[in-house]
Structure formats: C-alpha cells, structure tokens
Amino acid sequence: MKKSGVLFLLGIILLVLIGVQGTPVVRKGRCSCISTNQGTIHLQSLKDLKQFAPSPSCEKIEIIATLKNGVQTCLNPDSADVKELIKKWEKQVSQKKKQKNGKKHQKKKVLKVRKSQRSRQKKTT
C-alpha cells in the first residue's frame, strides 16, 4: 500500500513538473535599453548594429550599437540621425556581402580556367 501511494505521488509530481518546464515566463518592461545615447555615432566606429522589434518582454523598438572598442550603447530609434545610420550600415553590410560573393565567384572562374588549361595540355601531349 505504501509503495503504491508513493509511486502515485511521484507520478503526480512528475506530471506537474513537465507542465511547468515548458511554460515561458513573461515579464513586461524588461527591456535591454534603459536609456539611449544622445551623442552622434560615426559609421566608421561601428562594429555591429542590432535592431530588436517589440516583443512580449519589451514593448518598444531597441537598437543596440557595438562599437569597435567593444562598448555597447543603445540608440534612439526615433532619431533622424539613427535612422540615417541604420540605412548606411545596411548598405555597407550588403556591399560587403556582394564583395564576398564576388570573390568566391572569381575563384571558381580561376579554377575552371586552370582545369581547362590542364585538359588542353594533356590533349596536345
């Protein structure tokens, strides 16, 4: 009798813990940015720029800039300067991606040319 009672209680506890484990805890007002930087940030000093959309844990848009010296600062998403900085950053990132893809494409062309030159050399000998 005692064993069945203990097993029953363990089963109930297990079911409760499984239900609790998957439940997300929603906390309103837990934003990463408490205040925003009022100064100007230059594109050359940026290492990374991340934008976070409103979520259940934070109701406002957050923009966090990581500078080349490692300092992270929050930017005001409503500022005209910040909006311009975001446009320039996105343009710079897309240009870097294009350059990177272009270099890969050029390497493939060089390899193809070298292979075709080798096959021509084999045919002539």
UniProtKB/Swiss-Prot annotation:
GO terms for molecular function: chemokine activity; CXCR chemokine receptor binding; CXCR3 chemokine receptor binding; cytokine activity. Keywords: Cytokine, Disulfide bond, Inflammatory response, Secreted, Signal. InterPro entries: Chemokine_b/g/d, Chemokine_CXC, Chemokine_CXC_CS, Chemokine_IL8-like_dom, CXC_Chemokine_domain, Interleukin_8-like_sf. GO terms for biological process: adenylate cyclase-activating G protein-coupled receptor signaling pathway; cell-cell signaling; cellular defense response; cellular response to lipopolysaccharide; chemokine-mediated signaling pathway; chemotaxis; defense response; defense response to virus. It is found in: Secreted. Residues 1-22 form the signal peptide. It comes from the Eukaryota. Cytokine that affects the growth, movement, or activation state of cells that participate in immune and inflammatory response. Chemotactic for activated T-cells. Binds to CXCR3. This is C-X-C motif chemokine 9. It comes from Homo sapiens (Human).
